[in-house]
Amino acid sequence: MEIYDINGQIIDPLAGKTLYVAGDSIAYGKGSAGGYGKCIADRYGMRLINEAVDGATLATLVPDNVNGGYRTSIGMTVKSSTELEKADYILLEGGVNDAWNNAKLGALNGSFDPAFYSGDTIGTLEAMLDDLAKKHSDKRVAYVFPHGGLFASSENWYKTYKPAILSALKKWGVPYVDIEECAPPMGAHGVSELSDKYTIDGTHPNKAGSERFYMEPIAALLKRL
């Protein structure tokens, strides 16, 4: 149902709201400053807080073989954030770097006991969702899966990581949007012509890619929350 102002203009439910984004380089906007979060914020008149980090994983203590040390954990970033109170919407994304770096996957906890093991991918994801449910239950939370073509169909993203993350989201009642379902495959296992047009390297959407494939499906989900 649309809401109108006194002049008969549609009032968008996202206008004036604050969108918090956490995730990896796709959410960070390595191919387009601010990523899809900025595209959504600009299009719908939202305020944006983007704490996504290039190269981040869900799991903790995943070695960074490029820069040394360990990769930033998305779960720990969210749990320690001082920005969440400002948010109306919390948009999460991650797991691709876990799969690429063979992070320990872990298993879905059979209960809602908060004593989760936070070192592996699923344990950290569950701990993050548990923390959001307890401390930020007034926020509207959603998850984003990226476009297809980043992995071959036989690789562990499709066999283990993505199904496990999806199961955790369903357990915690977190809605999600899967960009792979509404965009052509790009990247190493996608359509090269589209990769050249809509990404900087097959993995990271440029501004055109964020607007063409990410912005509207994510905004539509946020409006339903």
Sequence positions of predicted segments:
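A short acidic, glycine-rich active-site loop
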Residues: 111-120, 200-203
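Conserved beta-strand segments of alpha/beta enzyme cores
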Residues: 47-49, 140, 173-175
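Catalytic His-Asp segment of secreted/periplasmic serine-dependent ester chemistry enzymes
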Residues: 146-225
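Conserved SGNH/GDSL esterase-like catalytic core that processes O-acyl groups on lipids
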Residues: 18-20, 26-115
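A general structural detector for well-ordered alpha-helical segments in enzyme core domains, enriched
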Residues: 36, 77, 121-128, 161-165
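N-terminal secretory targeting modules
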Residues: 1-22, 26-34, 38-47, 78, ...
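Alpha-helical packing segments of well-folded alpha/beta enzyme cores
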Residues: 54, 121-128, 213, 217-218
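Active-site segments of SGNH/GDSL-like serine hydrolases
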Residues: 93-97, 129-162
